[in-house]
C-alpha cells in the first residue's frame, strides 16, 4: 500500500517564477497579456477590448494554445490599482453612465465595437451638459395657512382680462346702487302681481289710485271746557274736541240721506225750507214717513 504525498499549494514566488519562464519562452504572448491587463477606455462592467496599433478595433482571436497560457499568466490586480481606477473622475462618470442603462454593441467575438473617438465625443457632451446645468431655486413649501392667504389676495391688474379692465370706468356706479334699484323694481313688480295690475302702466295706476290716497280734511274745533264742567284735564278737552260735531250739520246730513233714499217724497219736502221762520213746521210728518218705510 503506497502512501501518496498531498500536493503542495503553489506559493506566489513559484507562480512568479513560472510566469517569468513562460514570458521568456513566449515573448509575443507576454505583449498581448500586458495589453489585456492595461485598463482600457471601456467600462469595468463590459468585456475588455484588444488594442491594435493604438486603436480600439478588435484584433483576431489568438490560437487556443496561446489563450491557455494567457489565462494561466493572468494576475489579479491589487486593491491599490482598483482604488485608483475607481476613484478617477473619468471612471466615475463611466460607471454612472452604465448605471443609467448604457448598452454597448458587441460583435460576433463578444468584444465591444465602440471606438475611442466615440467615447471621447460622448464624454465631451456629458461634460457640456454638467457644465451648462443651472440649479433651479427651491420654492418655499405650501402650507394651509399660506394657501388660505393666497385665496384672499386680489389678482394684479396684469392678470385681468382686457375686456374686463376696459369695461370698468371711474364714473361707473358701484354695485350696491345697482342692486338697490333692482330690488326696488322687483318689489314694484311683486305689488303689481299681487293686486292684479300687471296689464297697467305706472301712469295709469297713479291716476286711478290718486283719489283714493287723498283723505278729506277734517275740521278741528278747539272748544275749551267751561268752568262748570267737571273734567278740567287736557285729555278730556281733546276728546271733546274730536267727538264734538255741530248739531245742525248732523241734521242736514240725515235729511239729505232721507231725500236720496225716497225720491218720491222729495217734492213733499221741498216747500219746507221755503216757509217763513215764524211759521211752525210740522215735525211729526217725517217721523211718520220713517215709520212707514221701516214697516
Swiss-Prot record:
Compositional bias segments (type: Basic and acidic residues): 102-113
UniProt-listed Pfam families: Whi5 (PF08528)
Signal peptide (residue range): none
Positions of modified residues (Phosphothreonine): 47, 57, 290
Record's GO cellular component terms: cytoplasm; nucleus; SBF transcription complex
A Gene Ontology molecular function term of the record: transcription corepressor activity
Subcellular location: Cytoplasm; Nucleus
Gene Ontology biological process terms, A to Z: G1/S transition of mitotic cell cycle; negative regulation of transcription by RNA polymerase II; regulation of cell size; regulation of transcription by RNA polymerase II; traversing start control point of mitotic cell cycle
Classification via InterPro entries: Srl3/Whi5 (IPR039198), TF_Nrm1/Whi5 (IPR013734)
Post-translational modifications: Phosphorylation by the cyclin-dependent kinase (CDK) CDC28 controls both subcellular location and association of WHI5 with SBF.
Highest taxon listed in the record's lineage: Eukaryota
UniProtKB keywords: Cell cycle, Cytoplasm, Nucleus, Phosphoprotein, Repressor, Transcription, Transcription regulation
PTM sites of type Phosphoserine: 59, 62, 88, 113, 115, 154, 156, 161, 262, 288
Compositional bias of kind Low complexity: 153-168
Induction section of the entry: By transcription factor HCM1 during S phase.
Acidic residues bias: start-end ranges: 114-124, 280-295
Region (Disordered): 1-171, 249-295
Note: Present with 1440 molecules/cell in log phase SD medium.
Family, per entry: Belongs to the WHI5/NRM1 family.
Subunit structure: Interacts with the heterodimeric transcription factors SBF (SWI4-SWI6 cell-cycle box binding factor) and MBF (MluI cell-cycle box binding factor), each composed of the transcriptional coactivator SWI6 and a sequence-specific DNA-binding protein SWI4 or MBP1, respectively.
Record's function text: Transcriptional repressor that negatively regulates G1-specific, SBF- and MBF-dependent transcription. Binds via SBF to promoters of G1-specific genes to repress transcription in early G1. During G1, phosphorylated by cyclin-CDK CLN3-CDC28 and progressively hyperphosphorylated by CDK associated with other G1-cyclins, which leads to dissociation of WHI5 from SBF, activating SBF-dependent transcription in late G1. Elimination of CDK activity at the end of mitosis by the mitotic exit network (MEN) allows WHI5 to reassociate with SBF to again repress G1/S transcription.
Name this protein carries in UniProt: G1-specific transcriptional repressor WHI5
Organism: Saccharomyces cerevisiae (strain ATCC 204508 / S288c)
Amino acid at each position: 500500500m503506497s502512501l501518496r504525498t498531498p500536493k503542495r499549494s503553489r506559493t506566489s514566488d513559484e507562480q512568479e517564477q513560472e510566469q517569468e519562464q513562460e514570458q521568456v519562452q513566449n515573448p509575443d504572448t507576454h505583449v498581448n497579456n500586458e495589453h489585456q491587463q492595461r485598463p482600457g477606455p471601456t467600462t469595468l462592467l463590459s468585456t475588455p477590448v484588444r488594442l491594435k496599433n493604438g486603436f480600439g478595433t478588435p484584433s483576431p482571436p489568438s490560437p487556443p494554445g496561446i489563450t491557455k497560457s494567457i489565462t494561466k499568466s493572468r494576475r489579479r490586480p491589487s486593491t491599490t490599482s482598483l482604488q485608483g481606477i475607481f476613484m478617477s473622475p473619468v471612471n466615475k462618470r463611466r460607471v454612472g453612465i452604465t448605471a443609467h442603462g448604457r448598452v454597448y454593441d458587441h460583435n460576433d467575438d463578444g468584444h465591444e465595437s465602440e471606438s475611442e473617438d466615440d467615447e471621447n465625443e460622448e464624454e465631451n457632451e456629458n461634460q457640456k451638459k454638467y457644465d451648462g446645468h443651472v440649479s433651479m431655486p427651491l420654492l418655499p413649501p405650501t402650507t394651509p395657512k399660506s394657501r388660505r392667504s393666497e385665496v384672499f389676495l386680489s389678482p394684479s391688474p396684469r392678470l385681468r382680462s382686457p375686456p374686463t379692465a376696459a369695461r370698468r370706468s371711474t364714473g361707473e356706479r358701484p354695485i350696491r346702487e345697482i342692486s338697490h334699484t333692482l330690488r326696488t323694481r322687483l318689489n314694484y313688480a311683486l305689488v303689481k302681481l299681487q293686486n292684479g295690475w300687471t296689464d297697467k302702466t305706472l301712469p295709469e295706476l297713479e291716476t286711478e289710485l290718486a283719489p283714493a290716497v287723498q283723505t278729506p280734511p277734517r275740521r278741528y274745533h278747539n272748544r275749551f271746557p267751561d268752568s262748570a264742567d267737571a273734567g278740567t284735564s287736557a285729555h278730556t278737552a281733546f276728546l271733546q274736541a274730536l267727538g264734538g260735531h255741530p248739531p245742525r250739520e248732523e241734521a242736514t246730513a240725515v235729511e239729505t240721506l232721507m231725500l236720496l233714499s225716497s225720491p218720491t217724497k222729495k217734492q213733499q219736502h221741498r216747500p219746507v225750507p221755503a216757509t217763513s221762520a215764524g211759521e211752525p213746521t210740522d215735525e211729526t210728518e217725517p217721523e211718520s214717513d220713517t215709520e212707514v218705510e221701516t214697516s
